[in-house]
Amino acid sequence: MSKLNPRVAHNPVLSRIIESGRTNLPSGITSAGSLSAYAQAAAVTIRDNRDREKREIADLNNRLARYVEKVRFLEAQNRVLENDIGLFRQAAHIHTGKVRDYYDAEKTSLATLVREQEAKVSSAKQNIRKLEPEITTAIRTLASSLEHRQRVRSDKKEQLKHLSDLESETAYIKRLINDCDDEKSHLKTEISRIRGEIKRILALRDKERNGFSRSQTAAQDLLKKLNATISTHEIAIREEINKARRDSTDKNREFFHRELHMSMKEIRDQFESDSKKARKTWEEWYKKKITEIKKRSEKFSLTQNQAREEVLRIRSLLNELRTKISDADSMTQALSKRIEDMKFREDEELRMFEQSLTEKELAVTRMRDECAKLSVELETLVENQINLRSEIAHYRKLMEQAENLRTSYQSDFVIDTPSPLMRTSSHHYGSSYSLNVRDTHNKTVHHDNYDISSASTINTQQFRSYGKGDVKIIEHKDESIVIENSNSYKSKDLSNWKINHYVNGALTGTFILPVATHIHPHEKISIHSLKSPNLMDDIVATQIYSFDFSKNTKTVLLDDVDDEVGWYAHVSYSH
């Protein structure tokens, strides 16, 4: 018994199997007791998979750690932002009083500025009187400058006519150049087409050459196959001859030998004739193709020579045209420079006259604007004076009636004639005044006149308007409301008045009337919403999309101190 391998000697199972003469070992274990190649590959794959899983788990742990760190950073940032918001809120409460002080100071400075402007108005009127003779002189100077400008323009027109003639000639030459360029591009296209045709023919020639080489290769392969077949047949024939030699007589052997030589000779003759015929056919086809390619190349070379001659002729013509164009350009530049010099002199003179005239006109415009402002203020003062006189007369009547009532009836409510006990307070908002009369018990009596207009029917629906004073909302039409001043002699200033539109008791939009909005006696003003088709009118409520006049809507008119002046709603609206 041969000596066993030490590894097998330590494995009793393998030793018994080998001693018993069995060779069917388990898969993956060789007779020497080591793992096979497949088992080793499987072990390597398992080890690689475990390493890859370990790396993925480490990567996931790192990503989780980064995510936790980012969350902590964002929480810290949120805490910092909350602290900043708290500081901003404290600062807002602290600086509110300062903003009020700034507003009061600005108001005082604006009042001072108004007084200064009033002082400047008188001096502006005097300056207007002084500037009138200078304006007359400036107008005369402007007329003379305009006459000079007309003469300069006539000369300029003549020079422009000459320049247009030169430009037309230049344009004609440029068109000739463009025509030559087109012809040149056409020739280039033709040359490129011819070159492409030559490349195509060369490619066909290369293709034919490749085909010929492939045919030769195929013929050689066929010849090799025939030689292999012949050798196979010769081997078979030799085997048959050997068999015939063993099994036949001399006569049969000679017969088979003779027949074999004759068949081999016929096969060789047939192969030689076929190969000669094929070679002759390929040679004739190759010569024919070479002849055709030579003829085409001669034709293309002739066309290319003609194209070269044409290009040379066009280049010479183009050089001549360029020379003429350069001469024309030099002349044009000289004329253009001369025209620019004349234009500069003319513009400089005209600019000086216009500058002086503009300064005078600006001064006059400023004076006119100041006068217009003064006239508006004067009209406002006159209106206020008229209103005060009418209100004084009205209150005199009330006081006379109160005096009569005091002498007729015994009452705790007493209205005396002007005395230290009666106190009147006058409040001015815009151009409207209200007067409060107090009795001896310090009770205020407001003389406000509430006017309730009659109901109106629009589109089979009834609406009602309520007004306090002369300005009220009277109707609506086409997504707009109509405001009327019922006073017959007094205008109203609607600056900063407000219009609030409510739907189902909720405020849906507010519009503030522009500054310097006045409504004259018996005048009607339409205020349109954004949904109105008449957006080109003067007043459009940009903060109110639609005046939805239904049973659940209400439109309220407020003055500049947010006191309710009137409202307009459906008769069934629940206030």
UniProtKB/Swiss-Prot annotation:
Region spans: Linker 1: 89-102
PROSITE patterns noted in UniProt: IF_ROD_2 (PS51842), LTD (PS51841)
Annotated stretches, region: Coil 1A: 57-88
GO MF assignments: structural constituent of cytoskeleton
GO biological process: heterochromatin formation; nuclear envelope organization; nuclear migration; nuclear pore localization; protein localization to nuclear envelope
Keywords of this entry: Coiled coil, Cytoplasm, Intermediate filament
Sequence segments annotated as region (Linker 12): 241-258
Region (Head), start-end ranges: 1-56
Region ranges (Coil 2): 259-408
Domain LTD: 459-575
Localization per Swiss-Prot or TrEMBL: Cytoplasm
Domain IF rod: 53-406
Residue ranges, annotated region (Coil 1B): 103-240
Annotated segments matching region Tail: 409-572
Function description: Cytoplasmic intermediate filaments provide mechanical strength to cells. Not essential protein.
Family, similarity comment: Belongs to the intermediate filament family.
Protein name (Swiss-Prot/TrEMBL): Intermediate filament protein ifd-1
